[in-house]
Amino acid sequence: MTKIKRALISVSDKTGVVDFALGLHKLGVEILSTGGTAKALREAKMPVIEVSDYTGFPEMLDGRVKTLHPKIHGGLLALRDKPEHTQSLKEHNIGLIDMVVVNLYPFEKNTQKPGVSIEEAIENIDIGGPSMLRSAAKNYRSVAVVCNPERYAAVLEELRNNNGALSRETLQEFGVEVFRETSRYDHMIYGYLKKHILDKAQDKEGAFPHCLGLNLVKVQDLRYGENPHQKAAFYRDAGETQGLAAMKQLWGKELSFNNILDLNAAVNIVREFSLPAAVFIKHNNPCGAAQNQDILKAYKQAWSCDRISAFGGIVALNREVDLALARLIAKSGFLECIISPKFSLETLGLLKDKKNLRLLELPVGAAPRGRPEQCATLDIKRVWGGALVQDEDILTLDENNLKTVTKQKPSKKEMESLIFAWKIAKHTKSNAIILAKGTKTVGIGAGQMSRVDSVFISTKKAGKLTAGSVLASDAFFPKEDAIVLAAKYRISAIIQPGGSIADEQIIQTADKCGIAMVFTGIRHFRH
């Protein structure tokens, strides 16, 4: 057990600190403090020793130097059971410090403010705080280090129950927690400065540095993971204010791991469209999608693609849910989630009758566009003993680069439909085949090991609507069998990347079948 006799308290987040310090004082602990923290404690009529008085050295450089002093760090780092250290402390008149209570400048919060300058961001980089935390944590066997206000109550309770002392287990736990906190803090600063002060010429490592760390902040614990026997939690990128973590749940029970996965897939698709759009997702694949001038019609068309698969699905919309749409949703059978930029109050009143439906609001902005090297987001997939890291697939279709390779040219209407289907194929598990009419899907074949099987499934889903539809494929056709099958079902046009060694044969087959074919030069595998 470690008896706490002297504590240094210097915090940015002053939540609960006065009551905590008062509790320490009642236990006979001497309090050292700095700046605003010392002021808050004095205002609470507590005896406080200013660090500058304790060290005999004033704060300087606009407060940049407060606690960087041997009398502070010597008192934290000295090994209590080492005679040489004890002797050095006596020679230099340095007292032991048994507890450090520090939390850091809110770098993340302050750098998210609109218009914050680099100079302002740099002034929010804490130096003294991490130094004290690390010194105390290095000597965790003898020094208690508290960096989280949520710990205050438990610390006081343990001190009261143990005559002002803390257990070895508590000190160990706190010491480890510090290095998690300081590493997160440093990584956040690194990410901000890399983004804002390095240009591409200076950033030698680019998106794939020698060592890659993740800086994630927990949003919530989840009931379980992909399956009930797996534990799970939802995290956001530190410093990120947009994305799924920003969604607001208006109604329904707690989101599951699979709900969030499917919501992500759904939102990524509707972000492809500027006109009103709706998408139904099941098991991370679209089972219906549509774009229309009217969001109500878009919803109807998306739902009609595959009503059986849509049961129990996730729906994303890029327009407000009004009362008319809410009435249609209420008649659509069981759905897990609806995510939309906005729900009106009367809409909420109607949809809350569906107890198992979750309603979520999220501003759905346009998807990032450009080339992968322009994307700041990394796509990370875990493998055994490591990870695969790549740019996010944000490459967009430039209609000027489309190449019609067949004698038959797609009509203007067919081209519009092909481009729509291509956007859906981009977000569908490979092998992906999308059949569309106008700007609505009529059949989707996803996740098959054989591309011709995906074509077959999409035609079965579309039924009579296959005739006159267009087809999008996320990757090239290795054989002409899929083209022959498409012709059998009277599909009129195909869009695909091209690039197969069998391209000439594929084109000849399309010509024989009277099918228009367009090459994009872009592949969108999704494993």
Predicted regions and their residues:
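N-terminal glycine-/serine-/threonine-rich phosphate-binding loop
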Residues: 1-54
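Active-site/ligand-binding-proximal alpha/beta "capping" segment
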Residues: 80-130, 134-136, 406-412
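Glycine- and Gly-Pro-enriched alpha-helical subdomains that act as flexible
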Residues: 287-307, 440-484
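Cysteine/selenocysteine-centered motifs that mediate thiol-based redox chemistry or coordinate metal-sulfur cofactors
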Residues: 315-316, 322-331, 464-503
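C-terminal binding/interaction regions
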Residues: 333-360, 485-527
